[in-house]
């Protein structure tokens, strides 16, 4: 299978490392021509994960997304969700026909409130059975250091999903298979919002006791949203009860791709969403925090998208709702979190 990686940030670089560590040649779209020249000459990405050295014979680098798409059978999408439309906008309607797409995007398209598969279906008539996601608690920095990590691959067909996942399995990366394509994407979006909230709490100097209660309630709020949006009876986790009448298993969100990713994004110092939230809690304006971070915190745009979606589905979301108000409606972080406190259990 010919792989193409779309994106050149930390996560795209980590995924390129995983594939090439398995001896897989890749086509790699990188927007910046100077970064391409640097990788060819110095064997590493000058901006992201510079400790990762690549075997350049396995890299076909290009700043043309059309060329990378045309040369690939399976495309790994790893650009921030806000840039998807601009990145893929130059492609023809049939450019993705017969190809597989693996989404590594833990975000939602702003203004459109679409998951990547929904966008691809609308713009390219992309087939749902050819769409996969790769999610889970896996920071790019730890992949670069080859610390043992777990990634969950989701797709409609288990056999095909296992085949795609097999290209990513290494001695430092275990793969998990899951059929919940929509649920894992929404969970990844929500955990970025909640991690931003955890950062705000840290910036406001709440302690570990409060933070643990906040995150536990975030997990419950996430589960409620997933059920409201229609994600039901998914088979994840190891402790599941089967309804004796319907024989359907109850939803269990204690698997690594849901709860695990929430925990690591809320607690880890690698988390850009937590870092962004920490600055907001300390009194930074959104604009100043964005300039200081100099990377995309997906939770910022996601908070508005989820707010708009929740107007329709009406899930109980006091935590995500307040994070939205702090970021978008100029509610002060301190008084805002005081309003959250009574909801926590």
Q: Which stretches of residues belong to each language-model region?
A:
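NAD(P)-dependent Rossmann-like dehydrogenase/reductase catalytic/cofactor-binding core
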Residues: 191, 198-202, 206, 227-345
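Conserved active-site and cofactor/substrate-binding residues in soluble primary-metabolism enzymes
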Residues: 6, 10, 14, 34, ...
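Rossmann-like NAD(P)(H) cofactor-binding subdomain of soluble oxidoreductases
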Residues: 61-70, 74-148, 164-166
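Internal alpha-helical scaffold of NAD(P)-dependent oxidoreductase catalytic cores
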Residues: 83, 94, 123-129, 148-251
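NAD(P)+-binding Rossmann beta1-loop-alpha1 motif at the extreme N-terminus of oxidoreductases
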Residues: 1-52, 58-63
